Amino acid sequence: MTLDYDIIVIGGGHAGCEAASAAARLGSRTLLLTMDMAKLAAMSCNPAVGGVAKGQIVREIDALGGQMGRITDLTTIQFRMLNRSKGAAMWSPRAQCDKTRFSEEWRRTLENTWNLYIWQDAATELLFAPAPETNAAPSDNLPDETTTSFNSAPGTISSAAESDADSDPTLRNAPSAAGKLAIRGVRTRMGVEFSCRKVILTSGTFLGGVMHCGASHAEGGRAGDAASHGITESLRAIGFETGRMKTGTPARLDARTIDFEILEPQYGDENPAKFSFSPETKPIKEQLPCFLVYTSKEVHDILRTGFDKSPLFNGTICGIGPRYCPSIEDKLRTFADKDQHQLFLEPEGSSTNEYYLNGFSSSLPWEVQWKALHKIRGFEDLHIFRPGYAIEYDYFPPTQLHHSLETKLVSGLYFAGQVNGTTGYEEAAAQGLIAGINAHRAMKGESPVVLKRDEAYIGVLIDDLVTKGVDEPYRMFTSRAEYRILLRQDNADIRLTPLGYKIGLISQKQYDHFTKKNTLVESLISFAREQSVKAAEINDYLKSVDSEPLSQGRKLYDILMRNNVTFDSLQNTLPKLRKFIAANEITPEAIEEAEIQIKYKGYIEREKFIAEKLRRLENIRIPENFDFHSMNALTIEARQKLSRIRPETIGQASRIPGVSPADVNVLLVKFGR
């Protein structure tokens, strides 16, 4: 057994599994360090993948060659395409998964990946060495000074300036906080020292994790798992800013004690789709339902009796929680006028009685949770497997990263997932994939993969983190993307599969499948452009779909731009169309893609024009280590923000909060229009 690797990934969650898989498949000798091999990519919270904007991210991961979409398809127990009633830019796939099988499939995938090795242990210390200037990869732009120190009160950001450097053993690895460092290895709890060239930190909620349930507090990364100590201290000692965040999870319920007969079922799609573009996975045939339940005034009154013992309200929890996934006690305080809240009862698998109560996350005392749950209709005889709890953990403000996800302070060290202040399996997996790709490419002296905001939701995610930072757990929404008509879930393969193939994560077989689909889409669009349709042969159809009849013949392409007119419904009316689709074996996926491109042509072209116009700013680079304080024409706030975040382009600078359009014009004058 060797103790030397190209890349070490710390943490076996969704980010770590994608990072390790990508790095190893690309050719780097990779070690995945995890505290429990039986819980790889564990679904620690809800047993689902996807959702609004998140589903688009999963399809992008798949299009680039990541694993999450494929493994989701293999373990799906219900599939729904959300927002079908809205425009195609808003369609978002979501799947309930069998959480046990999901983790098992990930383990099977990783154990069968050549060049990937797993070691069960806890990383406790990162090892550093001075970074030779010649080792700097294109993304290794290290700052001359360490980051500014912030107030280190509980729950706030702090840095090495406040730590006792003399007594901290990690400083034996670092010449000084201001020095340029490179990663050289990892030391574990068992005392094993691994050497490497790159490290990807994906430790989720485990760094300094503390769980809260009423007056009960315990260290841990999640229920049943120990917290991780040493890494945060190791990084703070050399100048990294750190902070605390909080998340939570609801009680798990025993299905045998629930009266499903009186609950409102929520079924999956009649014709379910899937996440992966690969033909090797198939849509699910037999689905399990979810159920809708509701709280009541009586439930709320019981919950309020525990507010004085809530760690969220009595000052015990200092970490910042997710705004868009609040606990039930948060909801009651924020929406005090509401007499009920909708909850979703979701199965955790096809062979378990365990159910997840989505919307009832709580850190109230367990007995308060118990009493309140029993007052929900259908839960009168309820047994719970475990109560809900909150968890606080360390994170690192992501403005300390390059867009490659490599840290600015340490060459060869990458962060991905919740350590960057994000929340959600999908956001974590996307970061892990990009970090794995870029760590490998840096090993080879190749430029990093940086997705732009008009290329992928993943690009929006990373740019938001690196440029704007976070002041609460970050989750993706379609509203965060300026170009969401370009970034649809249906065209993720068109946008990203050529890149995945060029990188080396998409196989020739997968790429051939992609090009075949693309050819079918283009051929159907061409047919629609060329095919003339007489008014007499289509007017009855148009009336049936409440569309204005034709006064003269039109091209099929123009007719398809109308609302309610679809390729599928036209096939019975236009035999030539039906024959063309059958003769060319055009798949339903290709038909849908062609139809969307036709209907949204004007919107797509407009967004492309705007994106190209703004991309000019992305091509104007700012010299690294430029002294923004020397530019008196900039506002003081802009000088401070630019000096701290150190944007690499004027485009990035323009998105920093506190940098005004006037400041951007000053930068344009300085660095060229």
Regions found by a protein language model. Name each.
Residues 10, 193-204:
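Short hydrophobic core segments
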Residues 36-38, 232-370, 467-540, 544-552, ...:
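An anion/pyrophosphate-binding glycine-rich loop and adjacent beta-alpha core
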Residues 21-125, 129, 190, 202-222, ...:
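Conserved N-terminal/central alpha/beta ligand/cofactor-binding core
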Residues 3-5, 189-198:
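Core beta-strand elements of the Rossmann-like FAD/NAD(P) dinucleotide-binding domain
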Residues 127-131, 178-192:
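Conserved beta-strand-loop-beta-strand element in the redox core of flavoprotein oxidoreductases
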Residues 2-15:
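Beta1/beta-strand and adjacent pyrophosphate-binding region of the FAD-binding site
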Residues 480, 486, 497-502, 506-665, ...:
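Extended, charge-enriched "interface" segments that sit outside catalytic cores
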Residues 356-422, 450-463, 587-641, 646:
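A glycine-rich dinucleotide-binding beta-alpha-beta segment and adjacent secondary-structure elements
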